[in-house]
Amino acid sequence: MERIVIALAIINIVKGDQICIGYHANNSTEQVDTIMEKNVTVTHAQDILEKEHNGKLCSLKGVRPLILKDCSVAGWLLGNPMCDEFLNVPEWSYIVEKDNPVNGLCYPGDFNDYEELKHLMSSTNHFEKIQIIPRNSWSTHDASSGVSSACPYNGRSSFFRNVVWLIKKNNAYPTIKRTYNNTNVEDLLILWGIHHPNDAAEQTKLYQNSNTYVSVGTSTLNQRSIPEIATRPKVNGQSGRMEFFWTILRPNDAISFESNGNFIAPEYAYKIVKKGDSAIMKSELEYGNCDTKCQTPVGAINSSMPFHNVHPLTIGECPKYVKSDKLVLATGLRNVPQRETRGLFGAIAGFIEGGWQGMVDGWYGYHHSNEQGSGYAADKESTQKAIDGITNKVNSIIDKMNTQFEAVGKEFNNLERRIENLNKKMEDGFLDVWTYNAELLVLMENERTLDFHDSNVKNLYDKVRLQLRDNAKELGNGCFEFYHKCDNECMESVRNGTYDYPQYSEESRLNREEIDGVKLESMGTYQILSIYSTVASSLALAIMVAGLSFWMCSNGSLQCRICI
C-alpha cells in the first residue's frame, strides 16, 4: 500500500503546472546555406537571385530601342539603301544589332575606328540628321553617277544615302576645297570616305587624275589619305574598296575638305541632340511591346532583387550579374517541426527538440498547461523586434547592392584580339569576385540570422527563469514545472514579466520539501527492493547450476571426482 502511495505521488509530481518557451514551426521546405551548414530548412526565406526573363526586347523606361533588324550600325549611319527605314529615327533607349547583319557596307571596304564609334554611341540617345553639303552644290563634279551594283535598290544600282561618290565631269576633276562651320550648339558626327580603285584604268576612268588625295582638317584633326590601287578579289562583284572615316565636330569649329579625286563626300551629318546612357546590344530578338528597367540580350528583367544570373551583358537599372545558381537569405528560424507522436511536454516543447506548428501568430512564445487547460501564446514584442531587425537588414542589403549597374559589350577589331582576350579574362575575374562576395555575404548573413533567432529564444527563456527562480523546476527541454498552482492569470503574469515571486514562494517551498521527501523515501524503498531482487536472483541461479551438475553426474555426462 505504501508503494502505491509513493507511485501516485510521483505521478502527481509529473502532472504539475508547466510553462514552456518555444518557437514557431511550419510546413516550409525552404532551405538556405550558412558558413557552417548547407541546406538548412527554415520557416521563412527570401530569394535574392533573379533567374527569370521574358525573352523579349522591351522599351526602357518608356523609350523604345532602335532595333536595326538586318542592318548594321555602319549600314544605318552611311545609309545603305536596304536600311531606308532608318534614315530618320526617333529617340532610342538602346540600339540592337544582330551578330552578323547582312546590310552593312554594301560596297566592300572598311570603317575606320568603327569600334570607337560604337563606344561613342553608348552615350547617345538621339541623332538629328542635317544636310551640311547639298548634293546639287557640286556643279563641277558628277554627283549622280557614283552608284554601284553592290548597293542595289529596286533592282537598280544605288549607293549610300548619306554620302556622295563624286566622279569626274567633262573629263575633269577640279580640286575640291570645301569648308563647313558648325554653328549648332550640339556636336556633329560627320562621315566621309575614300575610294581605292582596282587598277590605274579605273582610276583614270572615274577621276581623270592619277595622283590623288583626300585631305581633312579640323581644330583637332589633320588627315591626308592617298588611294591604294591594287588588284583584289571581288567582293559583292567589286574589286575596288572604300574606306570610311568619322569625326566629331564641336560647336564653333570648322571642318575643311580638299581632294582632287577618289573623294566620298558627306551630304548629311548627325547632330547629337541628346546624350545619356545607351548601348549597342547584340541580339536576335524582336520588339515585344513591353517596358522594363533592365534589358539583357536574351530578354528583359523586371525584378527588385539585387543579383541575377540571366546574362552578363545588361542595360538599364539592373541587378548585379553573378554566376551563382542559388542566393537565398534566411528571414525566419530553423524549421524543426514538432514530433507529434511523443507527446507535448518533455519531447517536443521548447527550443531544444522542435518548434511549434500550433503557434501561428509569432516567432517566439509560450505553451502552458494547468488545471484550466493548455494553449499557445506568442511573445509579440520579441517577435516584432526580430521582424523589424531582419526586414531592415534585408532591405539594407538589397538597397546597397541593387544600384544601377550596366555591363555592355565592348567592341574590338581584328587587330585587337589580344586586348579582347585580356579584357574577357579581366571581366571573368571581376565576375568571379562578385560571385564570391555575393555568396559569402549570404552565407554570413544567414549564419547571423539563425544565431539571432537562437539568441532571442534563449533571452526569452532566461526572462522566465529569472522570474520563477526556485518556484519552478527546469525540465531541461525549454519547460518549467511549477512547485505551486499557476492558473491562467498566473501564466499571463509570467509571460508579461509581472510574475509575483514572493506571492508563491511559501507554497513552492512546502511543495518542494514534500516532493523531496517523497523522492527520498521512494529511493530508500527502491534500494531495499533492488538488494532483495539481486540476492534472490543470485540464489536462484546457484540452485539451478547445482541441480544441473547433480543430474549430469548421475547419468554419466559429467564425471565428479573429490580428492582429499
UniProtKB/Swiss-Prot annotation:
Cytoplasmic side: 549-564
Transport is among the record's keywords: no
Glycosites: N26, N27, N39, N181, N302, N496
Lipidation, S-palmitoyl cysteine type: C553, C560, C563
Post-translational modification: Palmitoylated.
Gene3D superfamilies reported for this sequence: 3.90.20.10, 3.90.209.20
Cross-referenced Pfam families: Hemagglutinin (PF00509)
GO CC, one annotated term: virion membrane
Signal peptide bounds: 1-16
UniProt main location, coarse: virion
Membrane topology: Single-pass type I membrane protein
Subcellular location: Virion membrane; Host apical cell membrane
Gene Ontology MF annotations: host cell surface receptor binding
Site annotation Cleavage: residues: R342, G343
Bilayer-spanning residue ranges: 528-548
Extracellular side: 17-527
Keywords per UniProt: Clathrin- and caveolin-independent endocytosis of virus by host, Clathrin-mediated endocytosis of virus by host, Disulfide bond, Fusion of virus membrane with host endosomal membrane, Fusion of virus membrane with host membrane, Glycoprotein, Hemagglutinin, Host cell membrane, Host membrane, Host-virus interaction, Lipoprotein, Membrane, Palmitate, Signal, Transmembrane, Transmembrane helix, Viral attachment to host cell, Viral envelope protein, Viral penetration into host cytoplasm, Virion, Virus endocytosis by host, Virus entry into host cell
Cited function: Binds to sialic acid-containing receptors on the cell surface, bringing about the attachment of the virus particle to the cell. This attachment induces virion internalization of about two third of the virus particles through clathrin-dependent endocytosis and about one third through a clathrin- and caveolin-independent pathway. Plays a major role in the determination of host range restriction and virulence. Class I viral fusion protein.
Additional remarks: Major glycoprotein, comprises over 80% of the envelope proteins present in virus particle.
Family of this protein: Belongs to the influenza viruses hemagglutinin family.
Protein name per the record: Hemagglutinin
Organism: Influenza A virus (strain A/Mallard/Ohio/556/1987 H5N9)
Upper classification of the organism: Viruses, Riboviria, Orthornavirae, Negarnaviricota, Polyploviricotina
